[in-house]
Every structure is written in structure tokens, then in C-alpha cells.
């Protein structure tokens, strides 16, 4: 998420390959500096890149990490993530489902719950409003039928929709 008027930028999820995320960001904006991370849930592909913010790698100072309550508790109570909080490499910003917050004067986010395996945290998508355009970002979701929201109707209401499409059908991974 980039605000071209203020040059602020945020990423959704910190993947295990956060280095690649930051390189991609730099290729588009000229800088890897981020103003925050919006987490969706506590599965490895979505938050483990936070470890790079610690003293062993980037040694960041107070990067805002936006997370739902259970996700925030997970980070506070489990190492090595708890060290990021204790050493103030990250600053947890607790979110509430269906409540809008301003990232800055031009960008608003609203997390909303989606059905997924919630062993360690809730799972959220985001509605993001930038000036007059609205987009949704939906991460992993188990089954559309489990969600009380009609995805077709939701997509009709926004300008852009980004849906995680890692797997098309069950069984694609041999286990």
C-alpha cells in the first residue's frame, strides 16, 4: 500500500521472503522503508518475515504492526516474536474487526473476519480506502460457503479485489 502524496508505504503480511517483498517495493517506489505491516493471521506464510526486523538483521525501531487481538497476544507471548515487542523493534497496533482506522489522512483500513483455520489467531481480510478508491484484500480462506459474506456482492462494491489464490483445489500438495 503506497501513498504517493506522502511517500508512506505499508505491506500486508510479512512473508518468510520479506527480503523479496522489500526489493519489489523498492523497485516500484525507490525505497524499502516501510511505515507499517498489516498482518492477516498466524500462519507461517503471513508473519514469519517479522523476524527480519530484529537485532540480528534489520534492527528496526518501532515499526507499527497492525494485528487483531489474538494475533497480537500470539506475538507478545511467543518467541522470537516477543523479543521484537520487548526490544521495541515493532510496535503492536491492535485492531478490531469491522472498525476503520486511518493509516494517514489519505488511507483507511478496516479489517474483517474471514473463515480459516484459526489455531493461533483470527484471520482477517482488509478493506482499504485510498482517497476515493476502495479495495479488498482477502488472504487464505477455507471455503467461500463458510463465510456469511457473499463474495460476489462484496466484489461489486469495490474498485479492486485481491484474493489469495495459492491453491485451486484440495490435494494440490502431496502430503
Regions picked out by a protein language model, each given a short descriptive name:
Residues 1-25, 92-153:
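Core dinuclear metal-dependent hydrolase active-site scaffold
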Residues 7-11, 15-66, 159:
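Active-site metal-binding motif and surrounding structural segment of the metallo-beta-lactamase
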Residues 12, 40, 138-139, 163-165:
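Active-site flanking residues adjacent to catalytic metal/cofactor-binding acidic residues
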Residues 34, 87-89, 158, 165:
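Short, well-ordered alpha-helix to beta-strand connector turns
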Residues 61, 85-91, 105-107:
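A short helix-to-beta-strand connector/capping loop
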Residues 70-80:
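A short, active-site helix/loop in glycosyltransferases that binds the activated sugar's phosphate group
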Residues 134, 142-175:
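Cap/insert and terminal regions of metallo-dependent hydrolase folds
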Amino acid at each position: 500500500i503506497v501513498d504517493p502524496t506522502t511517500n508512506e508505504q505499508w505491506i500486508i503480511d510479512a512473508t518468510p521472503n520479506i527480503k523479496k517483498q522489500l526489493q519489489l517495493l523498492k523497485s516500484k517506489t525507490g525505497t524499502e522503508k516501510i511505515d507499517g505491516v498489516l498482518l492477516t493471521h498466524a500462519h507461517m506464510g503471513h508473519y514469519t518475515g517479522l523476524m527480519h526486523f530484529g537485532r540480528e538483521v534489520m534492527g528496526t525501531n518501532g515499526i507499527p504492526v497492525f494485528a487483531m487481538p489474538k494475533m497480537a497476544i500470539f506475538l507478545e507471548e511467543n518467541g522470537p516474536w516477543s523479543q521484537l515487542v520487548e526490544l521495541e523493534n515493532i510496535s503492536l497496533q491492535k485492531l478490531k474487526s469491522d472498525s476503520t482506522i486511518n493509516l494517514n489522512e489519505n488511507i483507511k483500513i478496516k479489517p474483517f473476519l474471514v473463515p480459516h483455520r484459526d489455531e493461533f489467531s483470527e484471520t482477517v481480510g482488509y478493506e482499504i480506502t485510498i482517497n476515493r478508491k476502495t479495495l479488498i484484500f482477502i488472504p487464505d480462506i477455507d471455503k467461500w460457503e463458510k463465510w456469511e459474506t457473499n463474495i460476489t456482492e462484496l466484489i461489486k462494491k469495490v474498485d479492486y479485489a485481491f484474493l489469495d489464490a495459492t491453491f485451486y483445489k484440495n490435494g494440490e500438495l502431496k502430503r
